[in-house]
UniProtKB/Swiss-Prot annotation:
NCBIfam families: purM. Keywords: ATP-binding, Cytoplasm, Ligase, Nucleotide-binding, Purine biosynthesis. GO terms for molecular function: ATP binding; phosphoribosylamine-glycine ligase activity; phosphoribosylformylglycinamidine cyclo-ligase activity. Its main location: cytoplasm. This is Phosphoribosylformylglycinamidine cyclo-ligase. GO terms for cellular component: cytosol. One of its GO terms (biological process) is adenine biosynthetic process. It holds the Pfam family AIRS_C. Its EC number is 6.3.3.1. InterPro entries: PurM-like_C_dom, PurM-like_C_sf, PurM-like_N, PurM-like_N_sf, PurM_cligase.
Amino acid sequence: MTDRKNGLTYADAGVDIDAGNRLVDLIKPMVRATARPGADAEIGGFGGLFDLKAAGFKDPVLVAATDGVGTKVKIAIEAGLHAGIGIDLVAMSVNDLVVQGAEPLFFLDYFACGKLDPVATAAIVAGIAEGCRDSGCALIGGETAEMPGLYTDGDYDLAGFAVGAAERGTLLPGKDIAAGDAVIGLASSGVHSNGFSLVRKIVERSGLGYDANAPFSPVMTLGGALLAPTKLYVKSCLRAIRETGAVKGLAHITGGGFTDNIPRVLPPHLGVGIDLPRLPVLPVFKWLAEQGEIAELELLRTFNCGIGMIAIVRADAVEQVSDILTEAGETVCLLGEVIEAKGEHRVVYSGHLDLAW
């Protein structure tokens, strides 16, 4: 084969295959640590494998979810804090699986950037692997795409794909949700992974940098506080579902807040009544509300406000379900009850949020 003195290489175009290979070497042990029954979590092949029988399922229904982290990525880039983004990526998909009563089985990620930094990217994958371990699913594959010209150097985006399973007949929401059922809230860890376009606008208005002390949490930088990883609710919720049989529905509170997400798990003729003074609003939301002069209803339709998961529970089992969730590490509060829907407003708020800080 003839060598061409002035011939171009892939590296000349901005794609470093060797950097990609270094990344694979760095992440292989992390990925391997996510192995579970049904998957050995070895990467390098053309596709990932999962054995449903080895996972113990008899008559499973598969449930799939995909999501990203939104513009929270921009804060991670500007703050130089990347590890938690990987946990966010997993949480956004596996939390959507558990609301349907499904156990997460495996996860794949897609990472795209302008110039691949193996060390920084490995930190993100470490977070993905941690999220997978904490939710009991195997990381069985992924794609790393270096795309100069489409992304600038330093910029990246990522997406996640999760598949879970539930035995036929056990999927949520149940068809027996009825007026009088209790509405329980599970505390969030922070802003989680939605609403960050508004968060960034508010930070810009405040004049603070992401390296400044967070006004609502002086022991942390603003960037570090805003980047608190999304809470994983998988193990606690699966335990409550399986041990009580009293969890009729779950709603993951993401974009759309309470207003848009809770109705997604309810029959058309039902709604919920939420007593806002019971909602434990985290300091970060109080600060965002003040700095952004955000109206209460806008806050409730944009952010989780301190509650990242809602459980619809049989009224006579509230204490039992709450005790199990608390034992599993959740902070739980009773927020209201299921009601007959009246008109187009299916989430009816009473009282007001406590936004004083």
